């Protein structure tokens, strides 16, 4: 008898083996095993039925456990490597300072309810609400702090491709866009009632973003919304009237993504024509084109002013642009597996190589030091802009399938009630906003940024959300 098993365990194993041979239509082998074991195993037909399938279940359980052990060992090795390369001082600083915080496994919450791939996520600028959209045609609203589903919004008739919070001063709205050719506006303060539907695009609407307001040269209100479509156009909408006030033409193929600059003066878009474009919102004209990708460009992002010193050094400049300037640097991610960082004139500064599949979404760290990316290779990567854009962290298997989106929770702005047009002492900037742009001249150890002249203070929220083809939304938080 094996020294590894007790007599009872050995008997159970033998019964399972005989039952397996009988179920596999191998009666001679089963009889031979019975004879070999003599009277040590009593197994009648009813008992054999009970043990049928037990051996296969045990086997698959062992395989699953082995995989889990390997995953845990890999994660443990990664954490040990991080500890070995860190000093007590740097660890303390990293744990306390949101400016240096990066996401790591495991996720704080795994949100499950969608029945088809998750395509997009978006954070409410003030509350702990997170919206997710899916190919299942629904939008789901979650409490990201509790990890609970709050409600399911139905209205679109095809896949929901993007969501974004923002809107007029005094009232945050949720915008969504879909393959059904429409954009819908929902009112969070009224049970997410559908208050307006914006038709006009001739094909799927890929992306939607509210345009921030308040800076010189930008729109005077938060009433504007930009959308990108497979019909090759960008459209700017007035959400109070529902009218399209401007159509931007220049792309020659599907426009996949669009972003608005923190002060609302510029737009950045890209798509299947492999070209990114920087637009002036007021004139509707293209200011710069960005050429170099070898496949469709899936995602775009404006670099926050906090990153200007690092990106200027990367570009070889002795002096960084002032933090009050807009759209100085941008980033693009492509199906060619690369990420590219550019200046506003379209000059390539750096190409980031590391992903093994399409790059699907980008998010700059509000502290300005890092760029985060997600990909169809199922990883989340963190690139350090102060170290020649070296990949300093990879969250492997962040999801079980292609990762389609990533968003960083908007900064909390202290003593800036004007952002929402009310008297609240704490508000948030969903897109960076003009107040955000003016509040980043100084950084204090708490992770808050403040204007030395007495302007508003911004607190970084160390929370990001990702969505995937695996039907899940994951929330990573400090």
UniProtKB/Swiss-Prot annotation:
Residues in coiled coil: 60-87
GO cellular component annotations of the record: cytoplasm; microtubule; microtubule associated complex; spindle pole; transferase complex
SMART domains cross-referenced by the UniProt entry: WD40 (SM00320)
One Pfam short name: LisH_PAC1
LisH domain mapped to chain residues: 9-41
Residue ranges of the TM segments: none
CDD domains xref list: WD40
Keyword line: Cell cycle, Cell division, Coiled coil, Cytoplasm, Cytoskeleton, Microtubule, Mitosis, Repeat, Transport, WD repeat
WD repeats: from-to residues: 113-154, 156-196, 200-247, 250-289, 292-352, 354-393, 398-439, 440-477
Function: Positively regulates the activity of the minus-end directed microtubule motor protein dynein. May enhance dynein-mediated microtubule sliding by targeting dynein to the microtubule plus end. Required for nuclear migration during vegetative growth as well as development. Required for retrograde early endosome (EE) transport from the hyphal tip. Required for localization of dynein to the mitotic spindle poles. Recruits additional proteins to the dynein complex at SPBs.
Assembly and binders: Self-associates. Interacts with NDL1 and dynein.
Family: Belongs to the WD repeat LIS1/nudF family.
Written domain comment of the UniProt record: Dimerization mediated by the LisH domain may be required to activate dynein.
Protein name: Nuclear distribution protein PAC1
Organism: Paracoccidioides brasiliensis (strain Pb18)
